[in-house]
């Protein structure tokens, strides 16, 4: 049973995974993988803190009392290295990243020129950042204990950066633990996977995820939403409670420039357009949605097509049950072979969703292909 502190920091559906960990015989590298937005990152940050904790052997880790725990909470632990793209740095223990050179112990890496790179580039971990982080490992532990390097999302590593990481995994520095996270483990190099202990983060069932989400929302002052609206958004976003929470908080704070908020708004417009079937204005839809995260739009399209395929086969929609009437109407007009081919196109597109050239042109091509599903 987890203590109340860890229970509040770790999502309940991840409690069994935490309790299965053997801190006395912890591997030098783990690869935690699972759906985006289900709490993997929060789990891993807490794990890093536990591995760096200097409390007594008999005490639960992290103890939250020792100097190492306090340093970690302020974002200044010298033996913690985080390697995450700019889009994820707000999820780390707080620290003044604005004045840092990239990368430093306890702090995330910045671009060499200190300026934000292009939108898609912000999601990529560069070879320079990776090399500097690995070089920091060779200096030695400041506290005489473990050193922990957290890398997320692992699939965002460029091939040259992944090869640099692979060399360190093949000959790991003493007392160094790699915590690697991936939303799509199939995109991680097999050679990297083979050198890690694989841990699967389970997705919560709908009731569990919604219970957790509603509890978090109840603690936000001034936020008022009906349970029906919360459940609708939860289903639309594929049952990822952490992602839904982030988007609702951003909307509550009226942060219209938040990347997740932009993507959710675009996704809703995209689905409204796709609900028109063969009457979709794919040029207009691409124009009004292409500034959102391409990966987010692709995921929404996949969920819609998955539901449409289910209805075509006589089943029920999983993600958009409120659109069952629309889906049933589309299913009667859909060319099954073209529908299957479109699904394959989406799968192929997701393999390259983070490529710098993934943009409006690709989105237009997919939406045009979608329209043809309902042609004569």
How would you describe each model-predicted region?
Residues 1-50, 60, 67-68, 174-176, ...:
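Charged, glycine-rich active-site and insertion segments that engage polyanionic ligands
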Residues 1-160:
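Clamp-loader machinery-focused feature within the broader ASCE/P-loop NTPase space
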Residues 32, 151, 165-166, 182:
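Hydrophobic residues in beta-strands of the RecA-like P-loop NTPase core, especially within AAA+ ATPase
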Residues 53, 139, 170-171, 373:
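Conserved amphipathic alpha-helical interaction elements at protein-protein interfaces in regulatory
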Residues 129, 160, 164, 300, ...:
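Charged catalytic carboxylate motif
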Residues 129, 149, 153, 161, ...:
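Helical "lid/switch" subdomain of P-loop NTPase nucleotide-binding domains
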Residues 131-135, 167-170, 214:
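A broadly conserved amphipathic alpha-helix scaffold signal in soluble, globular proteins
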Residues 138, 163-179:
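Conserved catalytic/switch belt of AAA+ P-loop NTPases
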């Amino acid at each position: 049973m987890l203590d109340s502190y860890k229970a509040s920091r770790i999502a309940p559906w991840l409690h069994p995974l935490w309790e299965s960990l053997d801190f006395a015989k912890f591997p030098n590298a783990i690869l935690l993988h699972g759906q985006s937005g289900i709490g993997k990152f929060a789990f891993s940050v807490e794990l890093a803190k536990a591995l760096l904790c200097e409390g007594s052997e008999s005490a639960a880790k992290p103890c939250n009392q020792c100097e190492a725990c306090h340093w970690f909470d302020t974002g200044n632990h010298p033996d913690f290295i985080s390697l995450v793209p700019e889009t994820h740095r707000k999820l780390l223990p707080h620290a003044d990243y604005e004045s840092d050179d990239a990368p430093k112990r306890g702090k995330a890496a910045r671009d060499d020129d200190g300026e934000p790179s292009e939108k898609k580039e912000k999601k990529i971990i560069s070879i320079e950042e990776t090399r500097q982080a690995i070089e920091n490992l060779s200096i030695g532990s400041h506290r005489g204990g473990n050193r922990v390097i957290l890398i997320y999302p692992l699939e965002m590593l460029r091939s040259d950066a992944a090869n640099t990481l692979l060399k360190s995994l093949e000959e790991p520095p003493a007392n160094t633990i790699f915590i690697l996270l991936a939303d799509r483990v199939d995109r991680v190099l097999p050679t990297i996977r083979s050198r890690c202990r694989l841990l699967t983060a389970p997705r919560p069932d709908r009731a569990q995820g919604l219970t957790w989400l509603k509890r978090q929302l109840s603690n936000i002052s001034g936020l008022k939403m009906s349970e029906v609206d919360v459940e609708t958004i939860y289903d639309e976003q594929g049952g990822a409670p952490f992602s839904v929470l982030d988007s609702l908080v951003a909307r509550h704070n009226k942060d219209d420039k938040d990347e997740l908020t932009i993507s959710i708004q675009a996704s809703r417009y995209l689905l409204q357009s796709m609900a028109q079937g063969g009457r979709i204005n794919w040029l207009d839809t691409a124009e009004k949605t292409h500034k959102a995260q391409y990966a987010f739009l692709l995921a929404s399209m996949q969920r819609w097509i998955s539901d449409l395929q289910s209805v075509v086969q006589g089943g029920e929609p999983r993600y958009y049950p409120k659109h069952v009437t629309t889906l049933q109407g589309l299913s009667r007009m859909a060319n099954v072979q073209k529908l299957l081919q479109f699904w394959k196109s989406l799968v192929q597109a997701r393999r390259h969703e983070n490529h710098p050239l993934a943009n409006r042109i690709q989105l237009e091509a997919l939406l045009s292909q979608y329209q043809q599903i309902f042609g004569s």
